[in-house]
């Protein structure tokens, strides 16, 4: 690379990733094959439209690539329809929502501070700006979704669309119960599995594909693919809906809402990376990987509990969990900074019914996908949890420096994918 300044920055990031324990639940490490696809000549090709229906010439090869990604996504999730063009999970949600309902309609999604996502109705997101947004949360006692409460809220506000999914909820979601509620109030159901897609694809969590009208996801996180979005449909794919004042099947409405509705040309190099990731996820080794992710996550959560810390909802069913730091007398923001100083990366996170501002927060979110991609096992994960507790409890800067060197020595023994 001729640009030495940029090259040095990339090398610094590579070094940071090698020498850090990565616990951000939404991050992962892609394979070298995915990186090769994303860094390929496909970045040169503009391909507005869809396979065999492009607005540019010279698209025969990228048509085959997109069709390959679509077929692999459908096989992986048991779907009848897939759109692999969304640039992100948020854009996948935007297209899915706008294909099902119109601006001003009512949305019912999970409260952001209880584990939801910005695109599920937050006032700072398009979903809260252009739609009449309502929210459900978790029970104060169990810190889990109370489906009877969701039903009562739905009956009270009569939403046009219910969104099931989360970004910091550690329990498996019952999508069938959400569909029952949606049917009772004549609402569409959108399931967002951005965080748990890998668990759904491998059968560790129940699948919403034939339950929801539409399912959205990211292609990174637990799928270990490139950063991007995905929209899927099962048996509802050919349901007739009113889109833009025209009767259309749901799959065609979604296609129109992705392009030209919310995006221009697709990123063909990223779609190629998605195709690689879908193939990798279809292998038995990937199911074994997800099993280890769940095992490592549970091991860390159980260790924190054994050390007297409180885990939101008392445990985890997936790849992440939230730690309430109130007992240690520090905030999530404090913990994030302390841990970054010892080469452990995670994020501050609000806990349900948090009294602190989200920019400060009472908790931290911990996820195991990235460390599992580096080969850490259950015992290694417990050691990671031990590093965290040592760092958060010490008042000594010398001890923090010592922990940092231990962390670097420990994690550097595990290869990057």
UniProtKB/Swiss-Prot annotation:
GO biological process, any: glycine biosynthetic process from serine
Residues with the N6-(pyridoxal phosphate)lysine modification: 221
Main EC class the enzyme belongs to: transferase
Location within or outside the cell: Cytoplasm
The keyword Nucleotide-binding belongs to this UniProt entry's keyword annotation: no
Principal location listed in the UniProt entry: cytoplasm
Pathway: One-carbon metabolism; tetrahydrofolate interconversion; Amino-acid biosynthesis; glycine biosynthesis; glycine from L-serine: step 1/1
Annotated EC: 2.1.2.1
Origin: domain of life: Bacteria
GO molecular function: glycine hydroxymethyltransferase activity; pyridoxal phosphate binding
Site (Plays an important role in substrate specificity): 220
Chain sites annotated for binding (6S)-5,6,7,8-tetrahydrofolate: 112, 116-118, 247
InterPro entries: PyrdxlP-dep_Trfase, PyrdxlP-dep_Trfase_major, PyrdxlP-dep_Trfase_small, Ser_HO-MeTrfase, Ser_HO-MeTrfase-like, Ser_HO-MeTrfase_PLP_BS, SHMT-like_dom
A Pfam family the protein falls into: SHMT
Role, per record: Catalyzes the reversible interconversion of serine and glycine with tetrahydrofolate (THF) serving as the one-carbon carrier. This reaction serves as the major source of one-carbon groups required for the biosynthesis of purines, thymidylate, methionine, and other important biomolecules. Also exhibits THF-independent aldolase activity toward beta-hydroxyamino acids, producing glycine and aldehydes, via a retro-aldol mechanism.
Subunit field text: Homodimer.
Entry's family note: Belongs to the SHMT family.
HAMAP family: SHMT
Official protein name in the record: Serine hydroxymethyltransferase
């Amino acid at each position: 690379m001729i640009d030495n300044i940029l090259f040095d920055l990339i090398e610094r990031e590579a070094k940071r990733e090698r020498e850090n324990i990565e616990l951000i639940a939404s991050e992962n490490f892609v394979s070298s094959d995915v990186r090769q696809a994303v860094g390929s000549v496909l970045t040169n090709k503009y391909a507005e439209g869809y396979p065999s229906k492009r607005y540019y010439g010279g698209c025969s090869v990228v048509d085959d690539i997109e069709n390959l990604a679509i077929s692999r996504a459908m096989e992986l999730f048991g779907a009848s329809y897939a759109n692999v063009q969304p640039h992100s999970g948020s854009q996948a949600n935007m297209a899915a929502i706008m294909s099902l309902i119109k601006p001003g309609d009512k949305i019912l999604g999970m409260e952001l501070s209880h584990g939801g996502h910005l695109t599920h109705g937050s006032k700072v997101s398009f979903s809260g700006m252009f739609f009449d947004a309502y929210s459900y949360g978790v029970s104060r006692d169990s810190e889990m979704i109370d489906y009877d409460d969701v039903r009562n809220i739905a009956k009270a506000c009569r939403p046009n669309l219910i969104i099931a999914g989360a970004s910091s909820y550690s329990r498996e979601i019952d999508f069938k119960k959400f569909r029952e509620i949606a049917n009772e109030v004549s609402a569409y159901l959108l399931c967002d599995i951005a965080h748990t897609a890998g668990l759904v694809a491998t059968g560790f969590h129940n699948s919403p594909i034939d339950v929801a009208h539409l399912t959205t996801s990211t292609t990174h996180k637990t799928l270990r693919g490139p950063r991007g979005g995905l929209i899927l449909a099962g048996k509802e794919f050919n349901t007739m809906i009113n889109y833009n004042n025209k009767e259309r099947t749901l799959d065609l409405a979604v296609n129109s809402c992705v392009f030209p509705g919310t995006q221009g040309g697709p990123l063909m190099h990223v779609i190629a990376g998605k195709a690689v990731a879908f193939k990798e996820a279809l292998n038995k080794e990937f199911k074994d990987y997800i099993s280890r992710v769940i095992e490592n996550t549970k091991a860390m959560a159980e260790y924190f509990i054994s050390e007297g810390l409180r885990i939101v909802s008392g445990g985890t069913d997936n790849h992440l969990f939230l730690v309430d730091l109130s007992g240690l007398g520090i905030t999530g923001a404090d913990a994030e900074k302390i841990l970054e100083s010892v080469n452990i990366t995670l994020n501050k996170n609000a806990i349900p019914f948090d009294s602190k501002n989200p920019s400060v927060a009472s908790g931290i979110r911990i996820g195991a996908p990235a460390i599992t991609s580096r080969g850490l096992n259950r015992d290694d994960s417990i050691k990671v949890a031990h590093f965290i507790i040592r760092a958060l409890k010490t008042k000594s800067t010398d001890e923090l420096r010592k922990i940092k060197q231990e962390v670097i020595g420990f994690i550097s023994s595990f290869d990057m994918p």
